[in-house]
């Protein structure tokens, strides 16, 4: 296939157009006065959202060079979402600002390699300053504040704080659609383990890459499954019952996996297979925990059982199961409460007896999963469009809250970024490396300016007023006041800010060192032959 090649400034200019197109679409959502973006879907109603990464993923540009620029910034948003689960809009704005300032300096004759070195030095220092300024979360109120700011809704913030209080900071919190208009919190028996689906073809939601099963049957075995004939008798019965199936096994491979995937794609079988968590004796113990929680049995050859002889009665049950590429969450298992209580007491006795700190830690993990339960936030809304938007906001808020618990909190509203600029050490570097450092310092001003502009105010004026204010003061965009941010509950997770700085500087500095851009040339479609051998256009 023929290629189109662009060089030097022409190449970078095209990339910049792509960067700006994507960033301009995303940055209107920043802050409490941020707007929504409407996304056309191939089926169903349009999606209305203010979630940066969701918007970024939808953007594809016609010009291949511009599309590459957009794709690079899309990577910033996706990476920030993967690391921290929030802060994707801030990361996108920072990347755009670094590219803009960097290209100005390249046009003035700066060396891109030295600029990149300066950007990397400044980013590293900014992250160190951020870590020093982060404050550990100390109260349930602070958890509520982080969640409220991320979701843009105080009620959601309170709900997430309640959920964390019930199941603990590391507990399992899931988000489901409610059948009413109310958004409520429920605590149900449940368990989460760190294994995801064995094949991405098993997902039920291809946009979010998750598999959700309602009222599934759960097959538990410590056996490696490679032949379909072992599963066939059982699966034929589940198909007749029109029940989805979760398979938890030592491994699923070969012919068995291929057949499951083909039948899933054909729609004849709704099945998700995952590997059992942990190893050795601990794996067997966790499988037994899941069996007791779901009211099933572990099909084990050590007990003289054969998979092909397993019956429906030996399968576990649950209200819902959600599987991602890394996690499986079983909610509201069908096990008897007396059996679960007996298992909990047995694990407590083992904890009291063991002398190994490692064994104690692993037993406590199992105990928490069996007794802690799962918090389910049921999202209520008047329409499906509102429901989708609300779910995205709650998921973002959950991610932000977990990030805050992990690495602490900092002043929100872009204030911490100005604080970082003031606190960064002096670098005794050459002029061009110093230019790279200056690029990052200027870029760190961009989020607070954008928050102000989304309020209809002059970003530069707001920036200067914050600079003149006492330490820790910033711009409260919701009430258009200058306040002490942490005291007013306007806080951000340090992890989210860190991910935004690291990912934006990484991708933007690489873009600035680009000298050549190569894209595929589109082949012109040949005109169809005229019917019946006539010349085209003749009737």
Swiss-Prot record:
- Name a GO CC annotation attached to this entry: GroEL-GroES complex
GO MF term set = ATP binding; ATP-dependent protein folding chaperone; isomerase activity; unfolded protein binding
Keyword annotations for this protein, in alphabetical order, are: ATP-binding, Chaperone, Cytoplasm, Isomerase, Nucleotide-binding
The cross-references to InterPro entries, in alphabetical order and at most eight, read: Chaperonin_Cpn60_CS (IPR018370), Cpn60/GroEL (IPR001844), Cpn60/GroEL/TCP-1 (IPR002423), GroEL-like_apical_dom_sf (IPR027409), GROEL-like_equatorial_sf (IPR027413), TCP-1-like_intermed_sf (IPR027410)
Name of a matching Pfam family: Cpn60_TCP1
One BP term from GO: chaperone cofactor-dependent protein refolding
Q: Does the keyword Magnesium apply?
A: no
Q: Which reaction does it catalyse?
A: ATP + H2O + a folded polypeptide = ADP + phosphate + an unfolded polypeptide
List, alphabetically, the PROSITE patterns matched.
CHAPERONINS_CPN60
Its transmembrane ranges are none
User: SUPFAM superfamilies under this entry?
Assistant: GroEL apical domain-like, GroEL equatorial domain-like, GroEL-intermediate domain like
Tell where it localizes. Answer: Cytoplasm
Q: Where does ATP bind?
A: 29-32, 86-90, 413, 492
**The EC number(s) this enzyme carries:** 5.6.1.7
Subunit and partners:
Forms a cylinder of 14 subunits composed of two heptameric rings stacked back-to-back. Interacts with the co-chaperonin GroES.
Q: Which family does it belong to?
A: Belongs to the chaperonin (HSP60) family.
Reported function: Together with its co-chaperonin GroES, plays an essential role in assisting protein folding. The GroEL-GroES system forms a nano-cage that allows encapsulation of the non-native substrate proteins and provides a physical environment optimized to promote and accelerate protein folding.
Q: Which protein, by its recorded name, is this?
A: Chaperonin GroEL
Species assigned in the record:
Fusobacterium nucleatum subsp. nucleatum (strain ATCC 25586 / DSM 15643 / BCRC 10681 / CIP 101130 / JCM 8532 / KCTC 2640 / LMG 13131 / VPI 4355)
Q: What is the lineage of its organism?
A: Bacteria, Fusobacteriati, Fusobacteriota, Fusobacteriia, Fusobacteriales
């Amino acid at each position: 296939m023929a290629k189109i090649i662009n060089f030097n400034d022409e190449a970078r200019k095209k990339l910049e157009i792509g960067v700006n197109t994507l960033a301009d679409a995303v940055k209107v959502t920043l802050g409490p006065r941020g707007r929504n973006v409407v996304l056309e879907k191939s089926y169903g109603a349009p999606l209305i959202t203010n979630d940066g990464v969701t918007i970024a993923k939808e953007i594809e540009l016609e010009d291949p060079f511009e599309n590459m620029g957009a794709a690079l910034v899309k990577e910033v948003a996706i990476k920030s979402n993967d690391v921290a689960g929030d802060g994707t809009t801030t990361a996108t704005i920072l990347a755009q600002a670094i590219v803009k300032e960097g290209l100005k300096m390249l046009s003035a004759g700066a060396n891109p390699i030295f600029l990149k070195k300066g950007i990397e030095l400044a980013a590293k220092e900014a992250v160190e300053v951020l870590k020093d300024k982060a404050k550990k979360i100390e109260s349930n109120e602070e958890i509520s504040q982080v969640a409220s700011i991320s979701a843009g809704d105080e009620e959601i913030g309170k709900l997430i704080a309640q959920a964390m209080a019930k199941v603990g900071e590391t507990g399992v919190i899931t988000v489901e659609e409610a059948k009413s208009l109310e958004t409520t919190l429920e605590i149900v028996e449940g368990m989460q383990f760190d294994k995801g689906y064995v094949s991405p073809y098993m997902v039920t939601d291809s946009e979010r890459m998750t598999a959700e099963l309602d009222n599934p049957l759960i097959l538990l075995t410590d056996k490696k499954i490679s032949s379909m004939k072992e599963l066939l008798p059982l699966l034929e019965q589940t198909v007749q019952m029109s029940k989805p199936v979760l398979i938890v096994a030592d491994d699923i491979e070969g012919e068995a996996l291929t057949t499951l995937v083909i039948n899933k794609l054909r729609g004849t079988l709704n099945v998700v297979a995952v590997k059992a968590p942990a190893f050795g004796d601990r794996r067997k113990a966790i499988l037994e925990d899941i069996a007791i929680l779901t009211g099933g049995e572990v099909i084990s050859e050590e007990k003289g059982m054969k998979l092909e002889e397993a019956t429906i009665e030996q399968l576990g049950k649950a209200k819902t199961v959600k599987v991602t590429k890394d996690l499986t969450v079983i909610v509201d298992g069908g096990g008897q409460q007396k059996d679960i209580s007996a298992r909990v007491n047995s694990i407590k006795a083992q904890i009291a007896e063991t002398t190994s700190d490692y064994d104690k830690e692993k037993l406590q993990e199992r105990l928490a999963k069996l007794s802690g339960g799962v918090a389910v936030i049921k999202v209520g809304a008047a329409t499906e469009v509102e429901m989708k938007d609300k779910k995205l906001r709650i998921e973002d808020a959950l991610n932000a809250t977990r990030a805050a618990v992990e690495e602490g909190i900092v002043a929100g509203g872009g204030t911490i970024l100005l604080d970082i600029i003031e606190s960064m050490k002096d670098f005794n570097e050459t002029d061009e490396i110093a230019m790279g450092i200056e690029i990052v310092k200027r870029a760190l001003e961009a989020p607070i300016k954008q928050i102000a502009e989304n309020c209809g105010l002059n970003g530069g004026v707001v920036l200067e007023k914050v600079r003149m204010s006492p330490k820790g003061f910033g711009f409260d965009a919701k009430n258009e006041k200058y306040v002490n941010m942490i005291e007013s509950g306007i806080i951000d997770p340090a992890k989210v800010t860190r991910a935004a700085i690291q990912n934006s500087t990484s991708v933007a500095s690489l873009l600035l060192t680009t000298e050549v851009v190569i894209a595929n040339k589109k082949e012109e479609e040949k005109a169809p032959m005229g019917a019946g051998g006539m010349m085209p256009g003749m009737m």
